[in-house]
Every structure is written in C-alpha cells, then in structure tokens.
Amino acid sequence: MAPEARQLKVHLRENEAVAQCVLEKWRSMEEKPGGLKENLAHTLYKSYRNVCAAKEPIRSLKDLYQIKGVGKWVIRQLKGSFPESSPDLSPPESNAAGEKGKKAGGSKRYVPQKNSAAYAILITLHRETINGKSHMKKQELIDATEASGLSRSAIGPDKSKAKPGAFASSQKDWYTGWSCMKTLTSKGLVAKSGNPAKYMITEEGKSTALECLSRSGLDDHAAPLVINSAPDTSNASHKLNNICMTSFVETSSGPSRAIGRPKTSIANPATKTSPEVTYLTSQESLNYNSDVRTAENCAEEIILSDSDSEELYTENYPLIGSEEFTERVAPPILNASNSGKTTTNYRFSDCSASISPRSSEGTFEMQSSSTMGIAEFNMLDNDTVCMDNSILAMPPRRSSKNFLEDYEVVLILDDRENFGGRSRKTVDNIHSQFRVPVEIKHLPVGDGIWIARDRKLHTEYVLDFIVERKNVADLCSSITDNRYKDQKLRLKKCGLRKLIYLVEGDPNPLDTSERIKTACFTTEILEGFDVQRTPGYAETVRTYGNLTHSITEYYSTHFSTGANTSQVCLTYDEFTKKCDDLKKITVSDVFALQLMQVPQVTEEAALAVIGLYPTLFSLAKAYSMLDGDTHAQEKMLKNKSTLINAGASRNIFKLVWAEG
C-alpha cells in the first residue's frame, strides 16, 4: 500500500522550506492522471521523512543529495522547484591542495557494469516486474538473480566459504554480490520499504535496466520463450558467451585469485594454425602447442580442452577396449607399426619428458600430444590413417542432409543433480539464455550428458561427452569416503571419450583446500580428465550452455566427413544398459583393486595391466613363459605399456611371482 502524503514535523527550522518543497512535489505527482506508482511513492516518502529528520541544514541540491534515500531521480524531480538549486548533482568532491588541473566534470548517470551483481539484480527485478510482481523480498530476489546467470559472481553468500575472518582478515571476505543493493537504492534505481524489506524497481531503474539490456545486446527474456528450430552454429565461435575459468591459487593479495588455465576451443579443420594455449600461474606459464583456434577475445575462450581421457572401454573387456586403447596400453604389441613414428599425439606417460624450459621467456613449453583429438578432437597427424580414432563417435548418417537437419542436440541433466534452491529454475535458465533444449533424466553415471535426437525417428544417440559436477565441499567429502575414485573409475568405464570434471566453488577458505587442489591436479594431469573450474552457480550454468553450443558446432562440422568413418554413437538405451552392466563385480575388477594396493601402481597402471592380463592366472602364466630370466620378468609389464613404470612393473612381479 502506498504511503499517504501527510505533513511531518521538521527537526530543523532551516529545513522547513526544503521539506515543504518535497511534500508539494509528492502531492503534485499524485494528482497527475494515473497517479503515482507505489514504489515511487515509497521513494518520495523515504526522502521526505529523512529530510524532516535531518540534523544539518540543507542549503543546496548537494546538501540534499547527502540525505539518505535521496537519489538522482528525486534530485531531478526537485531541480526546477528547489530553492537555491544548483546544476551540479554529483556528490561533493575534495578540493584539497594538490588537485590542480582537475576538470569539474558534470554528473554521470550510473549504469552498472555488464555481468556485475548490480547489473544482474537490476535486470532481474525489471523482468519480474514485467511478469507482474510489484516487489520482491531479499532471498527471493537473490535466488531469481542467481538463476538468471547474468552475474559473474554469486549474489548470496557462498556456503562453501568460511565465515569472514576465520581464515583471513581482508574486508573482501565480507563482500557478496548483494552488497551492491546499497548502491542501487542510493542511486534511486531500486526502492526499499517495509519489514521484512521489499524491493521495487523505480522508473529510473527501469530505464537503466533497459539500457543495460540494449548495451549488452540481450533480448528481454521476460516473455515466454518459443524455440522453433535448432540453434544456428555456423559461426558459433564468434557468437557464444565466453567461459571464464579460474585456477585455485593462493596469493599474497588475498585468499584466492582468479588466474588463467589451459583454454582451447573447437578448431576449424580447414584452418591449420597452432597457437599456444597457456596455463598461467602467479609467476610462470605452461605453453601447450596444439591444433586449436583461440577465440577473438584472448582473455575468455570457449573451452573444450585437451583431455587425455578418450579411451573407449569396449570390445573384449569392458574396462579397456582393444582398439581404442592400443596407443596407450601396449604400443609395442598392438600398434607396432606406429611405435617408431613421432606424432603430435599426447601420451601422458611422455608428459614429464616433454616439458622443456624457455628461460628467455620465463615459461615452460609442453609438446602436447593425445591419442584422440585435443581441442578439435582430431589431433592425429594428417598422415596417420585410423578409421575409428581420428574423430569422436558420430550418430548414423542416413541422408545427404547436414547434422542439424537430421538431429537435435539435447543437454541431459541427472535428476539427482543438486543446485540447491535453484534446481527448479536451472533448466529454464539454460534454455532461455542459450536457446538449447534441456531435459532431466535419471543417468546411470555422471551429472550431465549430451544426446543427438533423430528428428524423424526420435532415436537418441549419446554423444562422446560426459560431465561430473562437484561442489568443493562435496568433492572434499567424496575424497574422504572414497566415492571420488569410484566415480572417476565408473566414468572411465562408461564408454564415452570426453570426460569433463567440473569443480564449482573456491576451495581456498576450506581447511582441506590443499587436498582439493591436489585432487584436481591429479585428475587432470595424471588421469586425463578435462577439469573445468567455476567460481559458482552462475558460471556453471554458462559452462553448460557454452559447452552445448561448442559440441553442436563440432558435430555440425565433422558430421559429413566423419559419420562414415568413425564409430557409431551408442543409443541412450545401450548406454544405460552398458553402465548398469559395469556395476557388476567381475574377477578383473577384484584383480584391479588388488593391483592398486601395490606400491607405485596407479589406477591407470592397474587398468593397463588388466587390459593385457584380465586375471591373476593369465599374468602368472605370462611370467612363467620367462621363468629363469628375472630381469626380463621385472620389465615385462613396463615393456608392454607406457602407462606402467619400472617400479610398478617390478613390484607387481614381486607380488605375483617372486619367491619370498
């Protein structure tokens, strides 16, 4: 209910004329046709009440501007009728000695920066007003703003962080995105009233919100969204909103600092360029040479990074496929023809040997290579002939039509995926922001996958990407109770080649920050996952949307050439059945668990061993063939797989065959 324009007692006699001026302006606006909107009435009431209660004389507009609740909108309304009015509406600035040469600039209209918290709150409040809401309460507005994905930072407090002052004394610990509300109310863009507080956008706020939308090139998504066709991704590299990733690095400037991480983008196969993709730390960087095309804005890029996790666990044994794993498991036996050839493939066993210092630039250069593609998923040499491994698995091609004419790419989120109180809005938010279909299903593994749905037959094919999303707090608990290793093992065995591990939140304020950082490092470097890092929910939503566009672009580009030469994607039913079958414990699974108890035997090494020898009996039989040559027995596994180092090979031999 709008407050009544009634006269109040003025604390200072000198301010009676000013108070009367505000009151008369209020009454005159109420008498206009259509009256005065409730939120504007609250704004004028607050201004009038605080003018009446002022303890200092108000002699100019500058003095009036200092009164709490009086923003630029109120100043503009009173400018023509205020006694002794001044054209300068800006807050008074210091005129201390030494400020010579400064120009007395006029007032500058406040417009929030793009993707700032104020920007997101103002646009959200504007959209909700259009949808019929006259006001919003604090938590309701925070939830709606975070669900919009318009802010680069969280609006409400991050529950994964400790209380301010627990780990650092910086005043930044107290800041959240909601802190900008003070600025919005003081500038007259948002009106606040009642207890509990209710927030309403003013007319000035509406015009500012529209200006923000216009400057950002955004449509107003307040109206219902209708999608009639799949997105046009012919030039997606230039159209997508960029993903901004951060590494978890502590610096002297504060508990956490956002720095660069390896960034790659989907490459155009016709463009042969090799830019360097850097991984920056506080003082140094690792330069990855890969066949990728960077985005136009070097600070932000679309990321589908060079995961070394493309092995396909199919064929003879569900853990490791005989064909797809040959380059990494047993090149001397299964791929001897290529054993002496230098390629651009990234084999993570070669990682330590391929880093060379470049002292002149203070950086390190890594010769990147991967059995499967890195950024454009096709990093084999042009001379290498490999029907199945050159590109990712493709849906079947039944006509001469292009990919988007035959198929629709759909993002599938697990129904157990937890986004807190925002879960109900997550699907609509991704759908409205990125114009991509999103559905909820019960996934047997992972938190998100992408399917290609046949537009005529409605058959669903699972594309070669899967995401496991972890909040830093959940990641810490999963490490403690060993769910962490089991979940990663299930991801590796699911048959999809691009494994994305999405870590949400900042671990630095936590006691277990070092454990989380180590887990992220080993997951990416040693185990070949593509580890994506996001500061919070809003960035996670953008990551899902941008990955969907990038995946769509990749399949659109390679469908015409790769559909006849690559493997065929699993149908959704085949994928779920395969994952359900993996839950069954086999003799090889038990053998792998036993091997991982041996010193120096990693998960990758254990998988490599059982790929060669699925049971303990088969391994013992292989040792028996070399009986009498202890040196050869100790090196047998090392010679058959680059994933097994000399120490692990020797220790496994001692466990299985050596006496004593």
From Swiss-Prot:
Keywords: Calcium, Cell cycle, Cell division, DNA damage, DNA recombination, DNA repair, DNA-binding, Endonuclease, Hydrolase, Magnesium, Meiosis, Metal-binding, Mitosis, Nuclease, Nucleus, Repeat. Residues 82-98 have a biased composition (Low complexity). Induction: By DNA-damaging treatments such as high intensity light, UV-C and gamma-radiation. Its EC number is 3.1.22.-. Residues 411-506 form the ERCC4 domain. Pfam families: ERCC4, MUS81-like_WH. One of its GO terms (molecular function) is 3'-flap endonuclease activity. Low expression in shoots and roots from etiolated seedlings, and panicles after meiosis; moderate expression in young panicles under differentiation of floral organs before and during meiosis; and high expression in mature leaves. The keyword Transmembrane helix does not apply. Residues 82-109 are annotated as: Disordered. A motif (Helix-hairpin-helix motif 1) lies at residues 62-81. Belongs to the XPF family. PANTHER family: CLASS II CROSSOVER JUNCTION ENDONUCLEASE MUS81, CROSSOVER JUNCTION ENDONUCLEASE MUS81. Interacts with EME1 to form a DNA structure-specific endonuclease with substrate preference for branched DNA structures with a 5'-end at the branch nick. Typical substrates include 3'-flap structures, D-loops, replication forks, nicked Holliday junctions and also intact Holliday junctions with a reduced efficiency. May be required in mitosis for the processing of stalled or collapsed replication fork intermediates. Plays a role in DNA repair and in genotoxic stress-induced homologous recombination (HR) in somatic cells. This is Crossover junction endonuclease MUS81. It comes from Oryza sativa subsp. japonica (Rice).
